[in-house]
Amino acid sequence: MPDEYNISVQLAVGAQVSLDDPKVMPFEFALHQNYPNPFNPETKIRFDVPEKSHVSVEIFNLMGQKVATLVNNTMDVGKYTITWGGLNDKGAPLPSGMYFYEMNSSDYHKIKKLVLVK
């Protein structure tokens, strides 16, 4: 059996979600700061799921309007990385600026900032 795993799924337009290492089990929900930040053309957003749960990760503009849904699925236990290319739900590039990304599950809610620079 291989020692490395790379499981990737495209759950949204312009976003890819990867399970980092199925052997590593997080103990609590977490949403980590994206990197790089500011970013162009893409950024990575890491999040941890300690129990099988429905999880959403969404991007909002400064007016509070949802511009992209990166994850909206039942996720197994694991540490995940989203690679996002700054596209909205229709596949169009978003303008430069500050955005918020939000993770929600039944037991967790967190919001962080990211900056897209073109």
Model feature map: region roles:
Residues 1-2, 90:
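Short, solvent-exposed loop/turn segments at the edges of extracellular beta-sandwich modules
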Residues 3-22:
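Short, compositionally biased serine/threonine- and acidic-rich segments at solvent-exposed termini, linkers
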Residues 17-35, 39-59, 69, 81-84, ...:
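Glycine-centered coil/turn sites that cap beta-strands in beta-rich domains
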Residues 46, 71-107:
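Short, surface-exposed loop/turn motifs with a glycine/proline- and acidic-biased composition
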Residues 11-13, 114-118:
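Short beta-strand elements
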Residues 2-7, 108-112:
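Extracellular and select intracellular beta-sandwich modules with Ser/Thr-enriched
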